[in-house]
């Protein structure tokens, strides 16, 4: 799992069959931008939990879905500059 920050929505209307019309978000993973399927309805500025690989496909709705990164949760409290995080 990854912790990422949602930067902005990504709109793609011309897609391959099977890609459906799920919402896409541009997320920041450290210093690189990635595209993730939004399975939870997040918005720019949210810190989110993302999964990759086969977990991303299942979280997007199907093992055959062509995704390698899916947002599966919105983090309620996260300070990336804090030296220690509270475990819940």
Curated annotation (Swiss-Prot):
User: Any idea where the BMV domain is?
Assistant: 1-76
Q: Name one GO cellular component term.
A: carboxysome
Q: Which UniProt keywords apply?
A: Bacterial microcompartment, Carbon dioxide fixation, Carboxysome, Photosynthesis
Mind telling me which InterPro entries this protein's record contains? Answer: CsoS4A, EutN_CcmL, EutN_CcmL_sf
Q: Spell out the subcellular localization from the entry.
A: Carboxysome
The family database entries (Gene3D superfamilies) matched by this protein are listed as: EutN/Ccml
Q: Which GO terms describe its biological process?
A: carbon fixation; photosynthesis
Oligomeric form and interacting partners: Homopentamer.
Q: What is known of its domains?
A: The tight homopentamer forms a pore with an opening of about 3.5 Angstroms in diameter which is positively charged.
In the record, the note on similarity to other proteins reads: Belongs to the CcmL/EutN family. CsoS4 subfamily.
Q: What is its biological role?
A: Probably forms vertices in the carboxysome, a polyhedral inclusion where RuBisCO (ribulose bisphosphate carboxylase, cbbL-cbbS) is sequestered. Has been modeled to induce curvature upon insertion into an otherwise flat hexagonal layer of major carboxysome subunits. Has not been identified in purified carboxysomes; it is expected to be present in very low amounts.
PANTHER family attached here? BACTERIAL MICROCOMPARTMENT SHELL VERTEX PROTEIN EUTN, ETHANOLAMINE UTILIZATION PROTEIN EUTN
Designated name of the protein: Carboxysome shell vertex protein CsoS4A
| Organism of this sequence | Prochlorococcus marinus subsp. pastoris (strain CCMP1986 / NIES-2087 / MED4)
Name of the gene encoding the protein in the UniProt record: csoS4A
């Amino acid at each position: 799992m990854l912790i990422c920050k949602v930067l902005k929505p990504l709109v793609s209307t011309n897609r391959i069959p099977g890609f459906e019309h799920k919402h896409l978000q541009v997320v920041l993973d450290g210093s690189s931008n990635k595209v993730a399927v939004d399975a939870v309805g997040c918005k720019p500025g949210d810190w989110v939990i993302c999964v990759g690989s086969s977990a991303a496909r299942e979280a997007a709705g199907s093992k055959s879905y062509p995704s390698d990164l899916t947002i599966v949760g919105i983090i309620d409290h996260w300070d990336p500059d804090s030296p220690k995080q509270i475990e819940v």
